[in-house]
Amino acid sequence: MAESDAAAPAKAKPAALRKGALVKVNRAAYSSSLEAGASDPTAPDYIFEGPGELLVVKGDYGQVRWNRPVPDVWLRMDQLEACS
């Protein structure tokens, strides 16, 4: 008798963000990150509200441009989510 390997259903991965996507920063992921520790103690609200445009994706990082007169920033892709 063959035992069935009933694995728990895998959690569906969110769609991968690509160049040109509108994104915002996930507050929970960012607040406990190395990037947050190296930045201002209080992050600006606009990064959590979005939208920012994903300009470049290199490995685990993405460059985001906000619709404001501020420099572009590099953030880990796991800290970004699609802006709805």
UniProtKB/Swiss-Prot annotation:
Its main location: membrane. GO terms for cellular component: plasma membrane-derived thylakoid membrane. It comes from the Bacteria. Keywords: Membrane, NAD, NADP, Plastoquinone, Quinone, Thylakoid, Translocase, Transport. NDH-1 shuttles electrons from an unknown electron donor, via FMN and iron-sulfur (Fe-S) centers, to quinones in the respiratory and/or the photosynthetic chain. The immediate electron acceptor for the enzyme in this species is believed to be plastoquinone. Couples the redox reaction to proton translocation, and thus conserves the redox energy in a proton gradient. Cyanobacterial NDH-1 also plays a role in inorganic carbon-concentration. NDH-1 can be composed of about 15 different subunits; different subcomplexes with different compositions have been identified which probably have different functions. This is NAD(P)H-quinone oxidoreductase subunit O. The lineage of its organism: Bacteria, Bacillati, Cyanobacteriota, Cyanophyceae, Synechococcales.
